[in-house]
Amino acid sequence: MPTINQLVRKGREKKVVKSKSPALNKGYNSFKKIQTNVSSPQKRGVCTRVGTMTPKKPNSALRKYARVRLTNGIEVTAYIPGIGHNLQEHSVVLIRGGRVKDLPGVRYHIIRGALDTAGVANRMQGRSKYGAKKPKESKK
């Protein structure tokens, strides 16, 4: 425990909060060709690689991911949620923050149903998270 005198002389240091999705905190001014510190909730990017990855120890699966080059020039790894996808190289996608706990280095999610990404087919519950449209009512 510091004394009052020590606190008067030195003071408390502020804790630096590190962002969990740093690529969304950088912008790019293409006219001036400089990086800017403009945060955004989502960013657009182009897929450079689409593939599968195996998760960390207790889990076992083939998780779908895409390597995405964002409009600010940063390349990130993003998870493709849902069953089945239509992404391939050069697909334009929208990413949001949010890590995948069992995939190391994956800090972003691709938003389904936006830009080139199709929504999940035949999804009835939690549709908004997967870009699925409301199913048509069958006439009797």
Curated annotation (Swiss-Prot):
Task: Mark the transmembrane ranges.
Answer: none
> Known Pfam families for this protein?
Ribosom_S12_S23
Its subunit composition reads: Part of the 30S ribosomal subunit. Contacts proteins S8 and S17. May interact with IF1 in the 30S initiation complex.
Q: Which GO terms describe its biological process?
A: translation
Q: Please give one Gene Ontology molecular function term for this protein.
A: tRNA binding
What keywords are assigned to this protein? Methylation, Ribonucleoprotein, Ribosomal protein, RNA-binding, rRNA-binding, tRNA-binding
Q: What is the name of the protein in this document? A: Small ribosomal subunit protein uS12
What the entry lists under NCBIfam families is as follows: rpsL_bact
Q: Which CDD domains match?
A: Ribosomal_S12 (cd03368)
Q: Which residues carry this modification: 3-methylthioaspartic acid?
A: D102
Q: Which Gene3D superfamilies match?
A: Nucleic acid-binding proteins
Q: Which family does it belong to?
A: Belongs to the universal ribosomal protein uS12 family.
Described function: With S4 and S5 plays an important role in translational accuracy. Interacts with and stabilizes bases of the 16S rRNA that are involved in tRNA selection in the A site and with the mRNA backbone. Located at the interface of the 30S and 50S subunits, it traverses the body of the 30S subunit contacting proteins on the other side and probably holding the rRNA structure together. The combined cluster of proteins S8, S12 and S17 appears to hold together the shoulder and platform of the 30S subunit.
Cellular component aspect of the GO annotation: small ribosomal subunit
